[in-house]
Amino acid sequence: MEEKFVAAWMAKREAAQKIGVRLRPMEPADAMKQAHRALSGHRESDGFRILADKKRLDLSLEALAVDKRFTGLFNDEEANNALMRLLSAGYRF
């Protein structure tokens, strides 16, 4: 399941970059560690605010983390953080 998540996240990052969102480089091998770190902290993921401004939060790590295909990869705190960030930014499911 992790491999599918990483592939999906890398594809979403690529799509975000194509619409002008600048993201820090990330190696696929570090993706899960980066995802857990981003979702367990208080800061939004890389590019979240810009994606919100562009109304493309579907490309965010937070949206991917609450996707039913991948919820098993994250603990309750991480999933709740992702959900609260999305709801606070006005994301519609």
Regions found by a protein language model. Name each.
Residues 1-19, 83, 87-89:
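Charged, compositionally biased N-terminal leader segments and the immediate start
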Residues 3, 33, 46, 77-80:
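Generic alpha-helical secondary structure signal
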Residues 3-7, 26, 73-77:
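Alpha-helix boundary/N-cap detector
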Residues 8-9, 33, 65, 81:
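General helical secondary-structure elements
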Residues 10, 18-54:
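Amphipathic alpha-helical packing elements
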Residues 15, 40, 75:
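Charged, low-complexity surface patches
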Residues 54-93:
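Amphipathic alpha-helical binding modules
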